[in-house]
Amino acid sequence: EKELSLWREAGADRYLLRFETSNPELYKSIHPSLTGQEPDRLELLRTIKRIGYETGSGIMVGIPGQTFDDLAKDIETFRDLDLDMIGVGPFIPHQETLLGRKAKTPGILPEEQVPNTELMTYKVMALARLVQPLANIPATSALATLNTPTGRELGLSRGANVVMPNLTPKKYRALYEIYPSKACIDETAADCRSCMHRRIRSIGRQVGEGRGDSPSYKKA
């Protein structure tokens, strides 16, 4: 807490920490901790909020072992934490990771497993908007990876209100391939900016100006 407070005093005013899942056992299975070092992300998010940061968090949809009950609890957690920003993205497996190679979901029935689909992600985004109507909710690059032609546009029509342009220099983008076939990996930052503007205008929306503070944070 002291370190977070010092950063806040030094000028930091936003903090993003995904809790990934509200199910502690599922969280441990995807983020194994060293013995005696098991951070409580939910409690840390409460501390971040109390210190005065614009607070963002979020989840993956369709993690192996994630049930619909887990997902319902996640959505309730968005509300309980009173998040200013909510990131919701599909789990896209990467075969170079242990989680990406996990073929089975032990402990749950197949029909209980949340699908990591585009449609399910839209449903969660829409529900997140209902429980936190003033939060910033991004249409993510993961959605654009699942549906390159219209993923971001559909996200903006199903609860999202912001996008996150990729400013990473083109020559470094391939070094951050967190999932296969990531969208826009060959674009320059300028290409990305003009593309985002075009996509937003295509659905009758306007590009905002200013810092982009969450309406939820402004309310507080």
Residue map of PLM features:
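Conserved non-cysteine loop/helix-boundary elements of the Radical SAM core domain that shape
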Residues: E1-G52, M60-D82, T97-E118
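Auxiliary Fe-S-binding modules of radical SAM enzymes
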Residues: R79, M85-A220
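A cross-domain feature marking catalytic cores of carbohydrate-active enzymes
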Residues: F19-T21, T55-V61, V88-P90, A139-S141
